[in-house]
């Protein structure tokens, strides 16, 4: 089901979704993006950026093997199995991340600055997700606190190209997603922005 008012009208599964073996592995810079949550699962993705500034999203967690991030129920999208928290703590997430990355060299880890920096009480004072990750050896940088619309516009810009002319090395989108990242693909197809912070597909975007 494709939302009529999707925020990414240029996103096309035929054009923007590629097999995993088409994702470049040389001359790239790898980024890890984290959207932490409280009771829900964190949503994470890994992006390779090549020398032309093209974004290649090559991994997500949770994937659909954990569960769909959102489900169509009662005439609307609601949080699905993939969004349900699994009781993971900081250490669990670090082990999961290390297991998935193997020997990949990650240039930078970006985290949502709002929840990532939110303080909570611990035995000897207060801490935050960013501080706890840093202390455990996984240094994360707060992502620029852009307005949501600014972030969406940047992504729309990466997808933009002249669809009236044949695609070539210049006239093409600069954003691609691995076919294995099914939750992100669905989110880009369905996200409207109309549901604000509560919209079911917001986190993968």
Label every model-predicted segment:
Residues 1-36:
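ATPase catalytic-site recognition across NTP-hydrolyzing enzymes
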Residues 8, 16-20, 39, 116, ...:
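A generic signature of intrinsically disordered, low-complexity regions enriched in glycine/proline
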Residues 28-29, 41, 172-174:
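Short, surface-exposed beta-edge/turn micro-motifs
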Residues 35-38, 113:
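Short, flexible loop/turn elements at secondary-structure junctions
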Residues 42-47:
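Short beta-strand scaffold segments in enzyme catalytic cores
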Residues 49-51:
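Short loop/turn segments immediately following beta-strands, especially the blade-tip
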Residues 201-205:
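Short, intrinsically disordered, charge-balanced linker/junction segments flanking boundaries
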């Amino acid at each position: 089901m494709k939302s009529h008012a999707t925020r990414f009208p240029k996103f096309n599964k035929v054009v923007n979704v590629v097999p995993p073996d088409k994702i470049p592995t040389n001359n790239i810079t790898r980024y890890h993006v984290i959207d932490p949550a409280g009771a829900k699962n964190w949503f994470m993705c890994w992006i390779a950026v090549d020398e032309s500034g093209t974004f290649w999203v090559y991994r997500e967690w949770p994937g659909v093997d954990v569960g769909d991030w959102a489900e169509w129920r009662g005439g609307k999208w609601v949080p699905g199995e993939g969004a349900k928290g699994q009781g993971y703590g900081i250490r669990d997430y670090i082990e999961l991340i290390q297991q998935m990355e193997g020997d990949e060299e990650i240039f930078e880890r970006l985290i949502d600055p709002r929840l990532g920096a939110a303080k909570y009480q611990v035995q000897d004072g207060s801490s935050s997700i960013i501080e706890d990750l840093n202390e455990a050896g996984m240094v994360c940088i707060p992502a620029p606190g852009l307005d949501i619309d600014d972030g969406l516009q940047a992504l729309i810009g990466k997808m933009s190209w002249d669809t009236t002319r044949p695609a070539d090395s210049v006239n093409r989108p600069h954003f691609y997603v691995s076919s294995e990242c099914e939750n992100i693909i669905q989110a880009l197809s369905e996200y409207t922005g109309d549901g604000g912070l509560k919209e079911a597909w917001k986190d993968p975007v």
